[in-house]
Amino acid sequence: MEAVAKLRKSPITPRKMRLVADLIRGVKADKAFAILRNEPKKCAIYLEKLLLAAVASWQHKNQDIQLEDAELYIKTIQVDSAGMLKRLQPAPQGRAHRIRKRFNHVTLVVDNLVAYEKPVKNEEATADNRSNKKVKITDGTKS
């Protein structure tokens, strides 16, 4: 069962965040923690906290499964653009240049590599019962 964690309005540009997000996409969670701890970029701190939140959410949903036994991996990570904070910087001859401070939203989905089987209804038994029914076939004449 998958767990989702979202980071909203992070004060880093989406382009910079995607560089680090691409490093951990599809990687196991423990390896992703190692990658993020050794990454010098500021956005790695945000992604590490987000990954911790996603793992905690998965653990809360699956309390019957031990976290050590589960092989968690990052199923999807998506970095979207959020709003912009617009500023004006004075320029020569009475003009102004616009400064756009970009924000982003990150969505992280964590799932288990090992699929735990759920009990399935026995469809073979119901198929056998249907085929064993006796059917009386007549040709339409009275005898």
UniProtKB/Swiss-Prot annotation:
This is Large ribosomal subunit protein uL22. Pfam families: Ribosomal_L22 (PF00237). GO terms for cellular component: cytosolic large ribosomal subunit. InterPro entries: Ribosomal_uL22 (IPR001063), Ribosomal_uL22_bac/chlpt-type (IPR005727), Ribosomal_uL22_bac/org-type (IPR047867), Ribosomal_uL22_sf (IPR036394). It comes from Amoebophilus asiaticus (strain 5a2). This protein binds specifically to 23S rRNA; its binding is stimulated by other ribosomal proteins, e.g. L4, L17, and L20. It is important during the early stages of 50S assembly. It makes multiple contacts with different domains of the 23S rRNA in the assembled 50S subunit and ribosome. Part of the 50S ribosomal subunit. GO terms for biological process: translation. Belongs to the universal ribosomal protein uL22 family. Residues 124-143 are annotated as: Disordered. GO terms for molecular function: rRNA binding; structural constituent of ribosome. PANTHER family: CHLOROPLAST 50S RIBOSOMAL PROTEIN L22-RELATED (PTHR13501), LARGE RIBOSOMAL SUBUNIT PROTEIN UL22M (PTHR13501:SF8). Disulfide bonds: none annotated. Keywords: Ribonucleoprotein, Ribosomal protein, RNA-binding, rRNA-binding.
